[in-house]
């Protein structure tokens, strides 16, 4: 990098959002600079060492479908793989993997270092250069330089004015062991038009394996066959697999916590930031669920070359000596040694209602925000926002319109719509229950939903595109074959078939119709000579089975989506003055001005906006000749 003065895109932060942003914009042929305060912590897992889970696994698959790195990195570093929710159907089935933190970080950094058009700089950004409400660069006082760019993506995680708490002691820092915290950048941003609040998150103690009695615990091995995250990955890429373990807290544990709540920075009032609802500290669990005598605890190895274990389920910010008592009270951990204490961290976040759905600021052109800075929690939520921000930062540079997925198109669409429409007062976590179209938004079809549009953006290379097109072709061929292949009551396979069925067939039936039966699946079908064919890739026959088995429900959901798209594609003018619309209450006008919805669909989802108010807006648009449709729904 001979010229530090000008870039197309600057990414501030090297976490899970920043790395996806940097890779996306550079793949789209934009000269990109990723600035991080420590290159050795690029891709660091600051909390638990895992990727995926319910709802989160869907986001990882979507990032992969658009050419992102997270799924590939966990395939190369995962040491325990499982599929969750297998009994609840394909829609909510989610992949989760335990990671070797060192291997994961290495995989991410390697991807950055070999990427064309991408440069890395170790430095701390303390200010933005803004002219006429447009960002044009960043300021790095410690090395006395200014770097200019056409767009900037902020992915600062918990480092904006971060404060770490352990008991009554606190100190500045973005995470434990990393005392870098950007209070100056936070203050500069406060001086702009952004609404800024505080959130809190926390992490569990890490212990040494040699003091753990694993014999009294339940063992959790990897699933067989081994799951794979990336659509182009394989289980052969996985390193050695090792188990996780589970145990429980008990009455003694809870008594220790209750006795020392006065030393908790949360319960003593020292912390004002709002905690994550769905990842509560052990103190919160004991207080909120006082009727429970035990809470499950998972022991998660942090890697193949370390004896460090993450004690998942015991997130705490109590003093170190109390943490030691808590750990020693848990079955199997009586002699465990704490390597790193748990802690809580408070940090600044920006109200995401101040962002467009492209994650660009509504006030500062060319400035994009992604990750925990927008009020989310989790590596997966950060990565998903990161790839979206990177795409749109590049499209901004290329003078192309911004892009965002709809709610019916991706969990990423649900994520950004929830954030930008409702905002958040607590760390936002993705769940499958947040999507009204989850039957259509499955892990298995993320590539079918998003890879084509990613190819248009330049995120998918020729080899990946060839593999994807072949998969689509094979799915269609197999569906057609099963649709046109019949078995008859007098066929030689009929006896074996009837063993599979709850009721015998009396007339000819196609392979497609057989797969619609709940007791039938593709593996059983292929045991019949009538339907046997060349061996298909697992992704192909899984997709064929799901598309056929859920066809009736999917058609019904498509009808719902058509109704949703009518309002979603009815666009609202950017400069609309809601005071001009008769019949709107002051409350509704204030809500519209607060959110500045892009469409009737988004406007209708704002809490407190009534159907009558939406009707008034539609009538006004029609009278003004402004009833416009967004024809291209991508």
Swiss-Prot record:
Signal peptide: none annotated. It holds the Pfam family GIDA_C_1st. InterPro entries: FAD/NAD-bd_sf, GIDA_C_N, MnmG, MnmG-rel, MnmG-rel_CS, MnmG_C, MnmG_C_subdom, MnmG_C_subdom_sf. GO terms for cellular component: cytosol. Its cofactor is FAD. Keywords: Cytoplasm, FAD, Flavoprotein, NAD, tRNA processing. NAD(+) binds at residues 275-289. FAD binds at residues 13-18, 125, 182, 372. The keyword Cytoplasm applies. NAD-binding protein involved in the addition of a carboxymethylaminomethyl (cmnm) group at the wobble position (U34) of certain tRNAs, forming tRNA-cmnm(5)s(2)U34. Homodimer. Heterotetramer of two MnmE and two MnmG subunits. HAMAP family: MnmG_GidA. Belongs to the MnmG family. This is tRNA uridine 5-carboxymethylaminomethyl modification enzyme MnmG.
